[in-house]
Amino acid sequence: PLLAPFYGTWQVYKGIDGEHTHRNRWRYALDFHQVEKGRSYTQDGSRLSDYLCFGRPVLSPAFGTVIRLRDDLPDNQPGSIDLKNNWGNYIILQADSGVFVLLAHLMRGSIRVKRGDRVAPETIVAACGSSGRSPQPHLHMQVQQHASLGSSTLPLHLVSSLIQRGDTPIQFQLVASPSEGNSVRRAVEDHQLAAAVQLPIGRTLSYSVTGADGACHEEELRVDVSLLGQMRLLAENGAAAAFENQNATLAFYDRQGKSNELLDLWCLALGLTPLSSDAARWEDAPPAKLLPMSLMQRSVVAVARPLGAGIDSRYEREWVEAEGVWKQMGDHQLHIANRVLRARTVAILSPTAGCISLMLECCGKSMQADLTKYGQIADLGVPRWESAVDTENSNRANS
């Protein structure tokens, strides 16, 4: 998986299996350029400087090491190509995963790295150019088997991206394979939103949980780390879910242990949470066991889907200005045996207190969990502390 190798919004100029050059063993490649109002240039497009992407920073798409590069070829004037040096100026990186990544058609003299340099996804490595087989400025990216120039390509996809197809709303995609004409932007972490779901080791979250029968009880979740370094959110009865926070995304997985409605609600409502404030819509497929199903319903799922079933979950998020919180809403559908089990979740996220409220509606029943206090478990040199929460904001935002 690769991050988009640029700042801002670019468009896929040529996608996988694109005509002319993205064919046969070079089929898995993406070309990017910038477009405004359907044009990739200003003025009359006769000069390289007219093109929106020309000279823009090119970023490393992954952690890795610079293996090969070339930086001396001239940039073609618009409409011209260099067939002797197809790739133009280029950088080949070996990603930490072992594969090789080619960034091509770079601007002459713009490469900022040298062989052997370590790079990270935020490292500016060069500038977009028009060298090689490039009739207009653009950036070519491919994943390949070997370090040699022109090596066979491998399937590639982008992670944590904001994708727009035509006039449709922008959608966050954890894993994306954008097509020609799609607009692509790297999801950039919003620090306030990230703070709202920050889960450091030793954090405790105490909720007042109201079940479908109206009964209310207190329950605590806490954050711990396993012997192997896996971050986990733990319930009082030992139920647990692992999570990772990287590439501007909080993601929960590996739900283990006993049944726990509060932890399951948390994972259903917040299991995939992009930390970019520009991410207003996204989809996921969490496991069916997170839904509060009856024994009969679970039996039907087990028979119909013995290898496991995923929920069709669609999320939207908005900022509630009056309350100073984010409202993250999920619509969930499980299709089993010609029937559809529907559920709705709402999570209220405060920049200071975190997830202050969770709500679930499913099969005519409801569940509400309101944060009453949050704190930190004592550690050597770290004192224990707790802070109470005013739940009025969450109740108003939920209404």
Predicted features along the sequence, with ranges:
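Non-catalytic extracellular/periplasmic "stalk"
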Residues: 1-37, 42, 340-342, 348-351, ...
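Generic structural motif
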Residues: 10-12, 56-68, 122
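Zn2+-dependent peptidoglycan hydrolase active-site motif and core
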Residues: 53, 61-107
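Acidic, glycine-rich catalytic/binding loops that coordinate metals and/or anionic ligands
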Residues: 85, 142-261
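Short histidine-centered loop motifs in beta-beta connectors
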Residues: 99-122
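Short glycine/proline-centered loop/turn elements that form peptide/ligand docking sites
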Residues: 112-114, 130-137
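Short hydrophobic beta/alpha edge segments that flank linear recognition/processing sites
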Residues: 119-132
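N-terminal accessory interaction module
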Residues: 208-393
